[in-house]
Amino acid sequence: MSDDEGISIYDEVEIEDMTFDEAMGVYQFPCPCGDKFQITLEDLLDEQDIAVCPSCSLMIRVIFDLDDLPKPPTSGASGGQVPITA
């Protein structure tokens, strides 16, 4: 799914084994360092399959079927994007 040539993957995890934080739109899985691997629903919908741990260098490959993912929430015509001016 993703072009991860040269990336060292710690493990492969089925998405069914991960927990989904609906409020944040993030799938999580425990990391050996004590933190959690994380990948957003948006990344998965973009067919990216590498979840990273924010506390260490470990990464996992998430095994999933694109058709089985929850549909992203719709929040207006802008697709949830809000323009920001500097």
UniProtKB/Swiss-Prot annotation:
Fe cation binds at residues 31, 33, 53, 56. Its cofactor is Fe(2+). It catalyses: [3Fe-4S](1+)-[protein] + Fe(2+)-[Dph3] = [3Fe-4S](0)-[protein] + Fe(3+)-[Dph3]; 2 [3Fe-4S](0)-[protein] + 2 Fe(2+)-[Dph3] + NADH = 2 [4Fe-4S](1+)-[protein] + 2 [Dph3] + NAD(+) + H(+). Keywords: Cytoplasm, Iron, Metal-binding, Nucleus, Oxidoreductase. Its main location: cytoplasm. InterPro entries: DPH3/4-like, DPH_MB_dom, DPH_MB_sf. Pathway: Protein modification; peptidyl-diphthamide biosynthesis. GO terms for biological process: protein histidyl modification to diphthamide; tRNA wobble base 5-methoxycarbonylmethyl-2-thiouridinylation. The keyword Metal-binding applies. Residues 9-65 form the DPH-type MB domain. PANTHER family: DIPHTHAMIDE BIOSYNTHESIS PROTEIN 3 (PTHR21454:SF31), DPH3 HOMOLOG-RELATED (PTHR21454). Required for the first step of diphthamide biosynthesis, a post-translational modification of histidine which occurs in elongation factor 2. DPH1 and DPH2 transfer a 3-amino-3-carboxypropyl (ACP) group from S-adenosyl-L-methionine (SAM) to a histidine residue, the reaction is assisted by a reduction system comprising KTI11/DPH3 and a NADH-dependent reductase, predominantly CBR1. Acts as an electron donor to reduce the Fe-S cluster in DPH1-DPH2 keeping the [4Fe-4S] clusters in the active and reduced state. The DPH-type metal-binding (MB) domain can also bind zinc. However, iron is the physiological binding partner as zinc binding impairs the protein electron donor function. Belongs to the DPH3 family. This is Diphthamide biosynthesis protein 3. The lineage of its organism: Eukaryota, Fungi, Dikarya, Ascomycota, Pezizomycotina. The gene is DPH3.
